[in-house]
Regions:
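Structural/interface elements that position substrates and couple domains in central-metabolism enzymes
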Residues: 1-225
């Protein structure tokens, strides 16, 4: 993942090796010679196409889980139970079949990988004849979730106070703005005339309001903590 690529490589849960032909079994021996991490991953050998499908299917499972957690959060918010969202999701994640990872309410998924893989899997599923696939639904919900957050935060801001973002990259620890819902929400608020405060150490050198947001500098305030 962006922001932790080396650490993730050294501590992978699994390694997918895809190959075709009678010598593909050699891939495992080759990998073991170069594997230098601190954790012994499970290694899975399969055809090239199966490995490609597996890779994007893993990310699609995560995007679906993110979207499902956000949907639960929306249901609770609409039920006047916003303060209990974290408690409910934590309770659901306590079930060992589900787990706590990605069971959080907040911004939808973004970045260069999740949206791309989600759409690729949805497109491929449709191509091979799987209709009404979850990938398409997840992608549509993720886009709609941004609008939900915008409306919710505006309705909750009756005093028209400035909005604060502690980061605007698609996730903490990177400076990547690709499909970042935080960044998109900043643009939405600025377009509506709100002031925005941004505190993002990794983006502070890039935080020129005219470049990032297309607005005068006095509309966006960079906060150094």
């Amino acid at each position: 993942a962006q922001g932790s690529i080396i650490r993730d490589l050294q501590n992978a849960d699994m390694v997918l090796l895809g190959g075709d032909g009678k010598h593909k079994g050699n891939l495992i021996n080759i990998y073991k010679k170069i594997q230098y991490g601190y954790k012994e991953p499970s290694i899975h050998l399969m055809s090239t196409k199966a490995a490609e499908i597996t890779k994007i299917a893993v990310n699609c499972f995560l995007t679906t889980k993110i979207s499902y957690a956000n949907m639960i959060g929306q249901v609770l918010a609409q039920s006047n139970l916003y303060d209990e969202i974290e408690t409910v999701l934590s309770s659901i994640g306590s079930d060992s079949r589900i787990g706590h990872k990605y069971m959080n309410f907040g911004f939808g998924f973004g970045g260069p990988c999740f949206p791309r893989d989600n759409r690729a899997f949805a497109s491929y599923a449709q191509k091979v004849g799987v209709e009404h696939n979850i990938g398409t639904t997840t992608d549509n919900f993720n886009k709609a979730h941004l609008l939900f957050l915008k409306d919710y935060f505006i309705n909750d801001n009756s005093d028209d106070l400035p909005f604060w973002f502690d980061y605007i990259a698609y996730k903490p620890g990177t400076d990547i703005l690709t499909e970042s819902q935080q960044y998109q929400l900043c643009l939405e608020f600025l377009d509506l005339g709100y002031k925005v405060y941004v505190s993002d150490d990794l983006l502070k050198d890039k935080c020129d309001a005219r470049i990032l947001f297309g607005v005068p500098d006095e509309k966006v305030y960079r906060i150094d903590l």
